[in-house]
């Protein structure tokens, strides 16, 4: 294999693809990236048996071929090369020569035969969606994906496509996030995408470009400009999320989002990794009063907000509360409550583009 390629194109591609590379694997090739030089394109792939990222960049190919190179080392080399044009050449001993300006490297590669094939699958459904919409949907829900592997199904989000509407639902047992957008698609299907995959999708999405999603029985493929991201789907039964949203609402308040975030953030100063005291919220009259008491002190605050319905005193984990508030995209939110032990519901003042639920913490009588 012998080729010339622009360093900036190569560095960006290697950086993005390397996120799918296994940091430690019993298969040495999976700690590398696969380079394939054919035609006028250099194909670059990373794969950890759960998620694979592939892209193609323009290159001047003098000799076709394939090689697997250490992802960590190759990324560092490319990032620090002095000139814009990079020459990459391999020989029959799997030695890779990398030259740029006066700098040159010789590193040991591996045969592409040792690299596992990325999955292929039969498409059962497909969807095309604006990159901006998909980015906002994932960003406003992925925070609620569980990191507890005892229930693997909740380490991903449910993509629920029906009635020309796509909903993304994430839940971890303490909070739930739902985001929806209308789409031009007649399919009725559900599938569960791992949270890790969604995080990688976020880093690649361009707002101006559409994302094409191909769904199979066990795998999903996201096509984002020149990048292809293939991932396994999570298998199992997802919670009936519609039934978990409380129907009754005894208390409602419309609150400025930024003011609410600031108040909860101030209470959070008394909490830390080892301290988890609830933020106490009292909804009454025309204000919401906040307080927090922990082993290191006390704090109080209040903000103006017209409260309709019954007065209520309720407590929340500050981090869960803030995560929900920071991932809405409206200046004001509607807070709905059904007593001190029922989840808080956060929705837009108008419409139903998102729903966030936060389970309360029991309060002591102190």
Label each region the model flagged.
Residues 1-366:
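Structural preference for solvent-exposed beta-strand-turn elements
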